[in-house]
Each structure stands twice: as structure tokens, then as C-alpha cells.
Amino acid sequence: MKNTLFHRLKRPIAAAFVGALTTLAFAPYQIWLVALITPALLLILIHGQSRRQALWTGYAWGFGQFASGISWVYVSIAGFGGMPLAANLFLMGALIAYLAIYPALFTWSYQRFFAKATLLNLLLAAPALWLIADWLRGWVMTGFPWLWLGYSQIDSPLASFAPIGGVELLTLLLLVGAGAIAYAVIHKRWSMLLIPTVLLSTGYGLSHWDWVTPQPDKTTKVALIQGNVDQNLKWLPSQRWPTIMKYTDLSRENWDADIIIWPEAAIPAFEVELPSYLSNLDSAAKMNQSAIISGIVNQAEDGQFYNSILAVGLTPYGDYSFDLTERYHKHHLLPFGEFVPFEQILRPLAPFFNLPMSSFSRGDFVQPNIVANGHPMAPALCYEIIFNEQVRQNVTDDTDFLLTLSNDAWFGRSIGPLQHMEIARMRALELGKPLIRSTNNGLTAVTDHRGKIIASIPQFETAVLRAELTPTQGQTPYHQLGSWPLYIWVALSLALAWWRKRRTNA
């Protein structure tokens, strides 16, 4: 019986281990080749399995991937949730268990509809089904498109495909390569290993192609203020003005910058409470021919709260006034951090479901760019930068930069902020726009239009990042078309693989 049990569990156990290794493909490890190998191993592991067996093998792979890959979430739950260890572990386990459903859905559907390891099934059907599972994970329950495999390729030759089809195209190519490797191993057809080699070589060739044109005449000096404010102290009334003056003093030392940028919710107060201060800040910035952008919390007249971005100084908005129509309001809210699903049930259960600032309202999906010192910027607050379609639709022909403000202090010295920066870099590469990322305690950085970090400052330090950024003109194919070509490719791939299966079985 023990032998039978071991025989039944050995593939799921192996899959969990392989899934956990997938984290090595992402920041901070960035062994990008791992993202090609681990899905190939998953395809090999489910070869010959029943649908039910494949489902559990895929589930184990996903459990391993997310247990290691999003371990940083536990830092926030344990540090700020106010619950005992058992409750913290239960919540973390529940999140991992939920996310593992999507790899399980992939393996089950593959074995259900395309069980045979044919070339068409592995090169067309498997990548298409993987993308469908990714899209569902990025949409269901507001979505969590973290650890999409394509993000791991930001520094690989495949990165050159991102301006053409976005991070999803990179994921597709990884799965095509993984399918070829699986086919080679299963059928001992080693010539199929040429397929991932050709994909990587093509990516290298594309790296010399520029889809957009830099505009050196519009080069801009920016100063990013990293306040390094302790998250446990930030919202204490006694710390309000020390925090505000910290950012103010650091800004005074950098008035020669064209744009000064503070992080998400840098001002620990409602905007309506600070009209005199903000009016004086606006005047000082104008006097120094500069502009300041900051994250701030807002409350509308109807009582709704918003996580917002405001700009003062040299802006098209005139002298400072409390006008919420001239602010950017975060649209994609963080579950449990900024809104609580089923809050009437969950809020009474534990402090974690009743965190401060966890009752925000959404802004519109598409909003006007923030304009500072003549430069339009497409904003994304923290978690929003992981939603590629939202960022894409907020970039216009006039947009000079991508702007993301964040506060990753919730996640301490974990790998979370490093993965977050990796995702932000992908947005710059996809859209051909330089990226400005201002955070409370890191990673504060700026990238060029290829997603390469050109300046950064260390985490967990009070510091100012000075840099010069050059806007670009033009649109990448991904900016113009979005994911529609991939939707069509997925539909055609599944149709062709299904037609070939039916014809073979006839």
C-alpha cells in the first residue's frame, strides 16, 4: 500500500518541487532560462496521466510556484494583520491554494481535450490553454496577474518581443519553447530543441530594432524623494507633520529639478485638511520653475475615499485648489488592503480585514494623464502597474513618461518589491516609454524606454534619486493593438489542434 501511495504521489511531489523552482526565473534571482524549463517539465510530468491525475499534478505545480513566488505576502499579513500565527498561515495557505487552481485548470483542460503529446498539441494547444489560464487569473476576483512567466524574460533575448505583443507574447513563446522541449524528451526527437534556440536567436536579432524615437530636446530632470517612513508610524497623528516636513525639506534641496516626485500616499493626511500647506507648496514650486507630484488620500463630498495623485507647481491646473476632477484616482484597488470583498462578513472576523484605509472607491479605468512642467505622464498607483491593459489604455500619443507611485513598506525585506520593479520595467518596454517609479522605501528607480534601469537608489534609506529622462515619440505595435492578435492566435491554435485531433481519430 505504501508503494502504491508513493507511486500516486511521486509526480505531484515532483511537480510541487518544479513549480517552486520557477520562482528562480523572476527577480531577484533572474535565472530566466528556468521559465523555459519548468513548464516543459510540467508537460512531461502530465504525459500519460488521466485527467484527474493531471489536475492534481498541475495543482501541485501551482502550489509550489505560488508558495515560493508570493511568500512576500506573508510579511504583510504577519506584520500588519494583527492575528495569531495559525490564522496568518491559514490565510496565506488559502491564497496559495486559490492561485494553484489556474495551473490545475491548464493541465486538466490539456489532458481533457489534447491528451496526446503530438507536435500540434504541444506547440499550439498547450501555449493557448496556458494563456487562457493566465488571463483568467488576471481577471477573476479583480485579478492577480503576478508571476506571469513572461515577466521573467525582461533581461533575456525574448524581451525584444514585448513591444510587439506585450508580456503575454513572451509567455506564449516560453510555452512554445517548453512544448518543443517536452516533445523532444517524450519522443526522443532532439532536433526539436532547435525551436527554443531559434526563438531566442530571433529575440536577439530584434533587440537592435527601435519601435519609438527618443526626443533629446525634451530631456527632463527629475528628483524622486524616497522618505523611508516607518509604516507602523506613518499614520500616527504625532507623525503627520514630521513626515510632511521631511518630504518638503528634501524637495527644497532639489528645486533645480523640473519635476519632483513623492511616493504613494506620501502625505499622511486627507488633502482637504491641508489647503494652506498645499497652496504654499504650489507657490514655492512655481517660484522655482518646478512641479511636485505626490500621492495623497482624498475624501469626496459624498464621503467616498480615493487613493489619489496630485500635481502642484508648474501645471496646467492653475493655482492650487481642492478639485478632485484634477486628480488621478486609483482604479484597480488591492483586495483587503484597499477594499474588502464581502466586507460585511469578513470585517468583524479579524483585524486583518479591518486595516486602516481599506475602504477606498475606484477611479475610472481610463483617466487623463497627470501633467507636470509640460510633461504628460500616464499614472499607475502601486498594484495597478501589474495590469498591462489598464496601463496601455492610459498611454496617449502625448504621453512622455509612465509614472508609478508605490509604498512597498508593507512587504519589508522580501522579494516582493523586487518582483514589483521587474513588472514595472516590462510596462516601459511594452509601451516604449521611460518609467518613473517613486516609492517610500524602495525600489525607487527610473528606466529608459527599453525597460533598462538607468538610475536607482538603495532600499530602506532616506535618499533622493536625481536623473535625466528622454521622452519618446511613436507607438509600439503592442500599444496600438494590445492583446487582440494573441486572442486571435489562441482561438486559431485551439481550432487547428482540435480539427487535427478529430481528423486523426476519424
UniProtKB/Swiss-Prot annotation:
Subcellular localization: Cell inner membrane
InterPro entries: Apolipo_AcylTrfase, C-N_Hydrolase, C-N_Hydrolase_sf, LNT_N
Pfam (any one): CN_hydrolase
Membrane-spanning ranges: 26-46, 66-86, 89-109, 113-133, 166-186, 192-212, 479-499
Record keywords, A-Z: Acyltransferase, Cell inner membrane, Cell membrane, Membrane, Transferase, Transmembrane, Transmembrane helix
EC class of the enzyme, as a word: transferase
Family (UniProt): Belongs to the CN hydrolase family. Apolipoprotein N-acyltransferase subfamily.
Protein name: Apolipoprotein N-acyltransferase
Species name: Vibrio vulnificus (strain CMCP6)
